[in-house]
UniProtKB/Swiss-Prot annotation:
Disulfide bonds: 82-135, 165-249, 191-244, 196-207
Keywords, ordered alphabetically: Calcium, Capsid protein, Disulfide bond, Glycoprotein, Host endoplasmic reticulum, Host-virus interaction, Metal-binding, Outer capsid protein, Signal, T=13 icosahedral capsid protein, Virion
Residues that coordinate or bind Ca(2+) 2: 177, 228-229, 231, 301
Organism: Rotavirus A (strain RVA/Pig/Russia/K/1987)
Modification after translation: N-glycosylated.
Sugar-bearing residue positions: 69, 211
Subcellular location: Virion; Host endoplasmic reticulum lumen
Span list, region LVD motif: 237-239
Residues the record lists as binding Ca(2+) 1: 95, 206, 214, 216
Function: Calcium-binding protein that interacts with rotavirus cell receptors once the initial attachment by VP4 has been achieved. Rotavirus attachment and entry into the host cell probably involves multiple sequential contacts between the outer capsid proteins VP4 and VP7, and the cell receptors. Following entry into the host cell, low intracellular or intravesicular Ca(2+) concentration probably causes the calcium-stabilized VP7 trimers to dissociate from the virion. This step is probably necessary for the membrane-disrupting entry step and the release of VP4, which is locked onto the virion by VP7.
Protein's UniProt keywords contain Disulfide bond: yes
Family note: Belongs to the rotavirus VP7 family.
Keyword presence, Lyase: no
Name of the protein in question: Outer capsid glycoprotein VP7
Length: 326
């Protein structure tokens, strides 16, 4: 009997020692894996470019203000700059090597060759649909054209902010806007948007839901329209669907690595009156219109002052990421 008890005690003792050894071994293996993974993550994070949201210091005022024209001591070896310009600029300059010339001039301001990218667009519509804001800093040159002030101001509102959008099926559903940040954005070669506000019985308020000619017109033959209606009220919409698309969008906040330079025009377009623009400052400026060479020379001269008051953000997105995101 005593032999059986000793055997039982010995069995439990050996089992305890064996389990303890297994647990210690597992603990050592886990510690090794955790330290190894942590070490790899630290090394990779040091080698990669981390996001830098920066401080919100948007560009204010216009280029008519006397800025200091100086060359920075610090160059931008790790930054990229995208300069967007209309087709008419390259057409007027008519020089196959003009981009190389500008690259050499940017080099005198501390921007290495290969860090500045020149991107051409044909019109406001094309650029608003597919801006490709890929660089650390993105500067858009927009020629002021009489009669297109509304398209330009709405393009500014679109690309200076980030939007989260969903498609709208206006043939099946009524839609309402839930707050000041909620807008309907339509794009196309010719966008006419009409709305009919509805009461709680889904009857038209001042309009007939079955007759689009009685709807209120909120956008008429525009390339880009950001539509704002009364919040909390259902609306039936009528849109020229053959030449236009419309989406339900929410403004998420400022896109701080984008600035707009308005070329020409008596006054700078102001988008700060929109209560959804927060903070109430703007990243738009104006340069006097002369010739496109003169415009580019001015941009080169003041590029470092412009960039210093922008925020470099490595998550620059194109339209598929910020406009058509669902």
């Amino acid at each position: 009997m005593y032999g059986i008890e000793y055997t039982t005690v010995l069995f439990y003792l050996i089992s305890f020692i064996l389990v303890s050894y297994i647990l210690k071994t597992i603990t050592k293996i886990m510690d090794y894996l955790i330290y190894r993974i942590t070490f790899i993550i630290v090394v990779l994070s040091m080698l990669s470019n981390a996001q830098n949201y920066g401080i919100n210091l948007p560009i204010t005022g216009s280029m008519d203000i006397a800025y200091a024209n100086s060359t920075q001591n610090d160059n931008f070896l790790s930054s990229t700059l995208c300069l967007y310009y209309p087709t008419e600029a390259s057409t007027q300059i008519s020089d196959n090597e003009w981009k190389d010339t500008l690259s050499q001039l940017f080099l005198t301001k501390g921007w290495p060759t290969g860090s500045v990218y020149f991107n051409e667009y044909s019109n406001v519509l094309e650029f608003s649909i597919d801006p490709k804001l890929y660089c650390d800093y993105n500067i858009v040159l927009i020629r002021f054209t009489s009669g297109e002030e509304l398209d330009i101001s709405e393009l500014a509102d679109l690309i200076l902010n980030e939007w989260l959008c969903n498609p709208m099926d206006i043939t099946l559903y009524y839609y309402q806007q839930t707050g000041e940040a909620n807008k309907w954005i339509s794009m196309g070669s010719s966008c006419t948007v009409k709305v009919c506000p509805l009461n709680t019985q889904t009857l038209g308020i001042g309009c007939q839901t079955t007759n689009a000619t009685t709807f209120e017109t909120v956008a008429d033959r525009e390339k880009l329209a950001i539509v704002d209606v009364v919040d909390g009220v259902n609306h039936k919409l009528d849109v020229t669907s053959t030449t236009c698309t419309i989406r339900n969008c929410n403004k998420l906040g400022p896109r701080e690595n984008v600035a707009i330079i308005q070329v020409g025009g008596s006054n700078i377009l102001d988008i700060t009156a929109d209560p959804t623009t927060s903070p109430q400052t703007e990243r738009m400026m104006r340069v006097n219109w002369k010739k496109w060479w003169q415009v580019f020379y001015t941009v080169v001269d003041y590029i470092n002052q412009i960039v210093q008051v922008m925020s470099k953000r490595s998550r620059s997105l194109d339209s598929s990421s910020f406009y058509y995101r669902v």
